[in-house]
Amino acid sequence: LLLVGHGNVPLGSGLSSSSALTCCSALSFLTIMKIPVDKVKLAAQVAKSEATVAVEGGGMDQAVSLNAVRGQVSVINFNPLRFNQIKLPDGVVVAVFSSLKDSKKATGDCNFYNTRVAECRAGCALLLKKAGKWDNKVHMCLDVQQLLGKRSPSGMLAEVDGLPEKLTLQQLQVELGFESLHEMLQKLFSTQSGGVLIENAAESTQLTINSRLRHVYSEGFRAQMFERVLQTQSGDEEDRLATLSKIEELMNDSHTSCDIDYECSCKELNEVVAEAKKCGCFCARLTGAGMGGFAVGLVHAQEAHTFFEKMKGYYVRKGVKNVEEVLFLTEAGEGASEIVL
């Protein structure tokens, strides 16, 4: 079977170019073979493919790539994977703009991406140890929230406050009761591809714990609030503006948390987010894994042209020749589909 691919999603952009490729390949194969497609199940299966290049991804990119609905915000929940589609407020345009720095999870900055996963696993283990529920197994943040009986991610923030900000691997090993560093690496930090999350691990290797989990749980709470705000829209103009004001606060707080607590932003992303706000975006945040790539923001429809022209000038001053490759206005689009010719 020979598949020929073509796409216009910039590589290293943080706009799910890798997920677009894997989702398209899988859907094409199933269509050609006349195999019935369950896109929810397919999203979970495709998400596992990134583990073959030693990146411990989640599954959100694949889920939305296959199941998005035009004009709707996709609220994605896991364990099990399920969707809730909610309409964006009227009069809003989505702006997407580049930091002019590539974000490549599988090369270079991959270390930071997998290290964040390791730091979260370590924090989860410490939370369970404190609660007397540690069983020497890998647990995700949602697992811990459920095991501790917290209905909302916000309920975890007080628990996180008791965690140390930083620990060396040796200190973590002693705290969790592993007999050796090797045992801990294999049991707590192994990857699906058979490797370990932390390259060149040594007893003195330091992990950041408190800030990472504070970001994860506060971000989960922001996502819940975003969903709630959209669900309670009444449709009148006063309510629309109030909704946008709440969205503005949530998205801006999200970028700040990504930058300060999770440290997945960078000076280039922070610069372009700040510039976008100067040019008319009322809210913006990085998208994708971070450490470069693109950011996404919202613009009032009546101000979209002015915003675009101002941002275009910014990129021209940066020496960008093909501005259409680094800046575009769009809307929530449809997920993957097949057309049989």
Question: What positions do the PLM features span?
Answer:
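Short helix-coil transition sites and intra-membrane helix breaks within transmembrane domains
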Residues: S13-S19, D261-E263, R285
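C-terminal nucleotide
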Residues: V75-C283, G297-L341
